[in-house]
Amino acid sequence: MSRFLKHTLRCVVFLAVLALLLTGVSQLVRPKNNTSSDGIHDPAANGILGEPDNTIDLLILGDSESYSAFIPMQLWQQYGYTAYCCGTSRQTLYYSEAFLHKAFQKQSPKLVILETDVIYIDFSYGSMLLQEAGDLFPVFSYHDRWKSLKANDWRMTVNYTHTENAKGYQLRCNAAPADASNYMTPSDAYAPIPKRNRAYVERIKAFCDENGAQLLLVSAPSTLNWNMARHNSTQAFADALGEGRGIARYGDITLPMDEALIL
């Protein structure tokens, strides 16, 4: 056997052993239930993992704008749609995509809403790679759980049973009125969307298309995070996203109602 083949074989064996070790440790440290006491991150958003199979019509993704603006129980009461908000504070698009994939493991929503503030939250390649590594091997996301392992962690079985009564919505009691006198003043300005963010939205759109769901981009009112420049860029991006690949809908509820839904 040549030196090259020996070296290649050693590398393959090393990688195989490493993958087995990472898989085993990941099974040990990953939370066995979707509760904060079991160590899961963002338990309100991860409450969707405990919902009965195929009971969610509408999935909502985004940062704090999403879980503050959308009230799933109100959507159920007024329109009869079952919705769940997987929004988290300062959510990045790679985290939005991770929740999208987790939700579709047991659910088949026909509509996915992406709150658009998340499109402008920048992130590093390092954090993106760490998230993808954590999706593959949970030890990268839950490496600190070794300090709080319980007896049931050693059984390696995962059983998500926790559900959230508010379905991901988080009531904010400390909100104060904002000065909206110059909010959404008409402008032809455009705000740049980072290239990697565009790529993630395109991936989210492609996943929705492949799984029979429509993607709806929605801009919730925010005098701090939203303006006409971002609206204009998002509208142009949504138009391009839908060309030749089905309908990409964009609704900006910061605009007057007769202009808010642009299809």
Predicted regions and their residues:
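Hydrophobic beta-strand scaffold residues
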Residues: A83, L215, R249-Y250
